[in-house]
Curated annotation (Swiss-Prot):
InterPro entries reported for this sequence: RraA, RraA/RraA-like, RraA/RraA-like_sf
Superkingdom, natural source: Bacteria
Signal peptide range in chain numbering: none
Protein name in the entry: Putative 4-hydroxy-4-methyl-2-oxoglutarate aldolase
Annotated GO MF terms: 4-hydroxy-4-methyl-2-oxoglutarate aldolase activity; metal ion binding; oxaloacetate decarboxylase activity; ribonuclease inhibitor activity
Record note on cofactor: Divalent metal cation.
Organism field: Mycobacterium tuberculosis (strain ATCC 25618 / H37Rv)
Length: 157
């Protein structure tokens, strides 16, 4: 389900003080600086096999929220996984952890927000959980809710 993008500041003005605005300060990495879509989630720690499996499945404009426990020790997403996500219809990735291939990510037509970078690869054992509620920056990301992301931040409705 493709969602029309709305600026996060406009959503805050419309929703008011009860808005679900993520307090974490993510950096932009992908070729799109704004994106919106229904949320899917993966929780994994320094292992990206499960998220690669999820991103291999077609999406109609979804946003994958990846809880990597904030680890900057290894990258969960690089250019290969980002291109896979773009090719299967995902519109955005929110990574509570690190990415790599930062220069290449800027050229891929997908939104990517992450805490930072590390060139080190993650493991690939498949450990983790999917479609679970994830709380980041005071906001709970619930599968099926809608995430809006731009240069001002991330809103969940």
């Amino acid at each position: 389900m493709a969602i029309s993008f709305r600026p996060t500041a406009d959503l805050v003005d419309d929703i008011g003080p009860d808005v679900r605005s993520c307090d974490l300060q993510f950096r932009q990495f992908g070729g799109r600086s704004q994106f919106a879509g229904p949320i899917s989630t993966v929780r994994c720690f320094q292992d990206n096999a499960l998220l690669k499996s999820v991103l291999s499945q077609p999406s109609a404009g979804g946003v994958l929220v990846i809880d990597g426990a904030g680890s900057l020790h290894t990258a969960l997403v690089g250019d290969v996984i980002a291109e896979l996500a773009r090719s299967t219809g995902w519109t955005g990735l929110i990574v509570h952890g690190a990415v790599r291939d930062a220069a290449a990510l800027r050229g891929i037509d997908i939104g990517i927000k992450a805490l930072g970078t590390n060139p080190r690869k993650s493991t690939k054992t498949g450990a983790g959980e999917r479609d679970v509620e994830i709380t980041l920056g005071g906001v709970t990301f619930v599968p099926g809710d809608i995430a809006y992301s731009d240069d001002d931040g991330i809103i969940v409705v």
